[in-house]
Regions:
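N-terminal intrinsically disordered, cationic/polar leader segments
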Residues: 1-32, 41-42, 46-109
C-alpha cells in the first residue's frame, strides 16, 4: 500500500507531503495504481519547479520510491493550485481503488 501524508498549516496551505510504499495492486511493471500515483506526485513536483519560483526541498529514494517534499519559502497561489490538483487526483485514485492500495492522511502542523 502507498501512504501519502499531507501536512497543512493553520491557513490550510500544504507545507509538506510524504509518499511511501508501493500500492501492490498488481505485479511490478503492471501496477496501474502505483504508476498513477507516481505520475501525479512526480508531475506535481516537476510542475512546481518549472512553473513557479517557490523554494522547496525534495528527497527521493529511487530504490524504495519514497518522497519527502517540503516548501521552504512562502507558498505561491500557483504552487498551491498544483498541490491541490495532485490531492484531487490522489483522492480519485483512493475512491476508485480503495484504501487497500492508497491511504491519504492529512495532518495540521
Amino acid at each position: 500500500m502507498t501512504q501519502i501524508t499531507i501536512y497543512r498549516n493553520e491557513n490550510r496551505e500544504v507545507e509538506r507531503f510524504t509518499c511511501t510504499g508501493h500500492a501492490g495492486y498488481s505485479e511490478y511493471g503492471t501496477d496501474i495504481v502505483c504508476a498513477s500515483i507516481s505520475v501525479l506526485v512526480i508531475n506535481t513536483i516537476n510542475s512546481i519547479e518549472t512553473f513557479t519560483s517557490v523554494a522547496y526541498t525534495c528527497e527521493a529514494d529511487e530504490e524504495t520510491g519514497d518522497i519527502d517534499f517540503q516548501f521552504t519559502d512562502e507558498i505561491s497561489p500557483d504552487a498551491s493550485l498544483l498541490i491541490e490538483s495532485m490531492i484531487l487526483g490522489l483522492k480519485e485514485i483512493q475512491n476508485d481503488y480503495g484504501k487497500k492500495f492508497l491511504i491519504l492522511d492529512f495532518k495540521e502542523v
